[in-house]
Amino acid sequence: MEKKIPRPVIKRLGLYYRCLNRLYEEGIEYVASKDIAERLGIKSSQVRKDLSYFGEFGKRGVGYNTYELMERLEDIIGVNKYWNVIVIGAGNIGSAIANYEGLRKEKFNVIGIFDADRSKVGRKIGRLIVKHFSEIDDFFKKNIVEIAVLAVPENAAQMVVDKLEELGIKGIVNFAPVKLRTNIPVEDVDITLSFKSLSFKIERNIE
């Protein structure tokens, strides 16, 4: 039976990977859990505990080989290959994501953006042209699509998800403020939670 990995651990893996990337670019060959922890503002014991879910890493007294650990995390996270992404919803959030070049650098390649509003169809967003949602079947026939970003109104979200699941999408990043009914992996994003967390820290003078 596969070990269940807590969600906070999964989120921190991406932070570790980004940190190691920067360390490698700085020419640092070996790194200790303490070094990673200090850069991320967490405890070194947390770094070691998180990594232990996936096996043994590093050598006592030497630390981790930066490049080797980065490669291992690439395999674990799944960023050792490119993922094709589409965006559903060409409003402010959807347009910003489709136009964000940082995703491509992290191996998430946005290849299409769709909307049901015909007034938005044909608009150019970055290097993409907005297509009508009715064209999505044909798009899936011609392209391999693995991840969808959902940036649609709450009342349209479930209908869109049902269609995407029918087409064989593998995962969804959901910006709609609704719990989706689906059997595929979903990552819900609510930016208001970050603001609430920040206001909590400000009120209590927490770093």
Swiss-Prot record:
GO biological process: negative regulation of DNA-templated transcription; response to redox state
Residues that bind NAD(+): 89-94
One Gene Ontology term of the molecular function aspect: DNA-binding transcription factor activity
Pfam families: CoA_binding, Put_DNA-bind_N
Gene Ontology CC entries for this record: cytoplasm
Residue spans binding DNA: 15-54
Keywords tagged on the record: Cytoplasm, DNA-binding, NAD, Repressor, Transcription, Transcription regulation
InterPro entries: CoA-bd, NAD(P)-bd_dom_sf, Rex_DNA-bd_C_dom, Tscrpt_rep_Rex, WH-like_DNA-bd_sf, WH_DNA-bd_sf
Keyword NADP: no
UniProt KW Cell cycle keyword: no
Subcellular location: Cytoplasm
Functional summary from the UniProt entry: Modulates transcription in response to changes in cellular NADH/NAD(+) redox state.
NCBIfam families: PRK05472.1-3, PRK05472.2-2, PRK05472.2-3, PRK05472.2-4, PRK05472.2-5
Family in the record: Belongs to the transcriptional regulatory Rex family.
Known partners and oligomeric status: Homodimer.
Protein name: Redox-sensing transcriptional repressor Rex
Gene encoding the protein: rex
